[in-house]
């Protein structure tokens, strides 16, 4: 069992006495009614948002990483659950400190460019990028994810890509946008 550790978005209302734990906690559920922490991948910053962990080896997560604005894509090796490690990372071009933003990755005013979550299948990972649409990554070398393709539908549509679910048997990816504004007032999705 894994659990994300993320500082709440409303952290201005969180007392300073509450510790900022950021990362991935790993638990043994040998005794399901008595989960026991056995490992911890500690990260700096606000921590880990969404996670996908189905193969028993790698967790695919949206995480705050040093030197990268907002969330990036982190692949955590959990094959030794008592000693989890970073296996690979990818970030939206232009979001790493000192990196120039390529023209095709430039956000419009008010847009949020960061990783929301990732769902891998085989040697591909399908990554939701909030207002930057989605990207398909080649993860055949887990330590160096590489962009295969990118599509951004915001604008003209409302954006805030939440989930990108591959349907390999149908050669499709279903992308779902999240409503984050009052009364769903952010344009057609």
Regions found by a protein language model. Give the residues of each.
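Feature marking well-ordered beta-strand scaffolds used for ligand recognition
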Residues: 1-189
